[in-house]
Amino acid sequence: MSKNYHIAVLPGDGIGPEVMTQALKVLDAVRNRFAMRITTSHYDVGGAAIDNHGQPLPPATVEGCEQADAVLFGSVGGPKWEHLPPDQQPERGALLPLRKHFKLFSNLRPAKLYQGLEAFCPLRADIAANGFDILCVRELTGGIYFGQPKGREGSGQYEKAFDTEVYHRFEIERIARIAFESARKRRHKVTSIDKANVLQSSILWREIVNEIATEYPDIELAHMYIDNATMQLIKDPSQFDVLLCSNLFGDILSDECAMITGSMGMLPSASLNEQGFGLYEPAGGSAPDIAGKNIANPIAQILSLALLLRYSLDADDAASAIERAINRALEEGIRTGDLARGAAAVSTDEMGDIIARYVAEGV
């Protein structure tokens, strides 16, 4: 690859800097093995930015992200900043404004049960034995969270509250295309989640998804009601490849998918805009209770790098190399403390070293 790429690196707070260090070790291995020209610049965000600049998202950080091809984000927040007004705290003052500024309308959250980690899955052993590898594609900027009107009015027995589920054609079309394009990189199946037996917004959702599906004759499309989908994820998650969801339904199902893997330390997340620019981050939090102890699981951060390579840099070979290296490490029984269950555990640094070495060796 001859193109030059630039990544904005935002380590953040808590375990963020520790796990980000491991992801950058792996990036070095990718650069060397695949002869990719990738540069990085570090910027403060969240609590670290409050401490150093007096605000959770400094203008220099936003400008640095604007000049990058993608953003690799760590995690933000912690007890130190909880006394601040909500809109000035690291989470609401940094991550949400970044999503809004870059018009990140789609959220991709993979949930995979890795071989050797079946015991962590809360489902029945015979279900866990089948494994699963699901990508939840969630629309982020429309739906009931943002629809108008919303509010409260009246008093006494006539007091009421109301929210409005609104979806425009363009919002459904663009998130559907993300799901179908993602399925082409995976197992060629999309399951669209709705409530088209009741909701007008879901009827439109299903109609438009069917229209977009005609552009992807190689992709199998199924529709499923949200209530049935929550049950089917428990009954047989292996049946799913890509889940296409509205904002509300994706909020619910992505967390359910995460829960059945058994470890938040393994789950990456991507938020994309229409130009393919993305913000990539672990699905878990900043875990301030274990920060600085060199025991955090860096795999979610490393997998976030893999997503960045796949979706923003179109480097699928490099992303797959990272995923294979992680699979190899787990198959060999290499575990950080959250996965060790009394067995010997490796440190954050050691896990990063092992995965980087496996990428370099081309396992």
UniProtKB/Swiss-Prot annotation:
InterPro entries: IsoCit/isopropylmalate_DH_CS, IsoPropMal-DH-like_dom, Isopropylmalate_DH. SUPFAM superfamilies: Isocitrate/Isopropylmalate dehydrogenase-like. GO terms for biological process: L-leucine biosynthetic process. Its cofactor is Mg(2+); Mn(2+). One of its GO terms (cellular component) is cytosol. It comes from the Bacteria. Substrate binds at R99, R109, R138, D227. SMART domains: Iso_dh. Binds 1 Mg(2+) or Mn(2+) ion per subunit. Disulfide bonds: none annotated. Keywords: Amino-acid biosynthesis, Branched-chain amino acid biosynthesis, Cytoplasm, Leucine biosynthesis, Magnesium, Manganese, Metal-binding, NAD, Oxidoreductase. The record marks Y145, K195 as: Important for catalysis. GO terms for molecular function: 3-isopropylmalate dehydrogenase activity; magnesium ion binding; NAD binding. Its EC number is 1.1.1.85. Pathway: Amino-acid biosynthesis; L-leucine biosynthesis; L-leucine from 3-methyl-2-oxobutanoate: step 3/4. Mg(2+) binds at D227, D251, D255. Belongs to the isocitrate and isopropylmalate dehydrogenases family. LeuB type 1 subfamily. HAMAP family: LeuB_type1. Homodimer. This is 3-isopropylmalate dehydrogenase. The gene is leuB.
